[in-house]
Amino acid sequence: RPMIRHQTGPKDLVAVQSAYTAMDANADVHPFINDMAAAFAWADLVVCRSGALTVAELAAAGVASVLVPFPHAVDDHQRVNAEFLVRGNAGHCVIQRDLTVETLAQLLRQSRDQLLQQATAARALARPEAAQTVATICEELAA
């Protein structure tokens, strides 16, 4: 039986908790998750939006993902962000209007081997040295 950890925001907390309770789902619902690194480490699969920092964190954590880009993002940048992980075989992108119960259920039924392959691919895309690289370039330009 799947275990769910869901960040809702404070506005939707009670409604989401009630929905999971009604379904007898094994769900831990939070208005906000302070330690996202720990949450990603706990997860086999993350379903989320695809902001730039989120995509970078998914790669750094080495976790498989289903990315649902925010449909009103400027210049559709969240879809572009999601494609980075998709091209690297690290996740799936589902446009919000195409997200159905059936589509999500199919993605949630991926085998452990598939999830592990995606997680490994995500980790390979990570650039943990990026901040140091940018700092070095800035120092060189300033010199």
PLM region spans:
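A short, well-ordered alpha-helix in the C-terminal region of glycosyltransferases
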Residues: Q114-P128
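Donor-nucleotide binding loops and adjacent catalytic segments primarily
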Residues: R1-C48, R79-E83, H92-L104
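Two-component system phosphotransfer/interaction surface
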Residues: L99-D113, A135, E139
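A donor-sugar binding/catalytic signature common to diverse glycosyltransferases
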Residues: M36-Q78
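Residues in the short beta-alpha loop(s) of Rossmann-like NAD(P)-binding domains
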Residues: T8-K11, P71, P128
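C-terminal alpha-helical cap of glycosyltransferases
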Residues: R127-A143
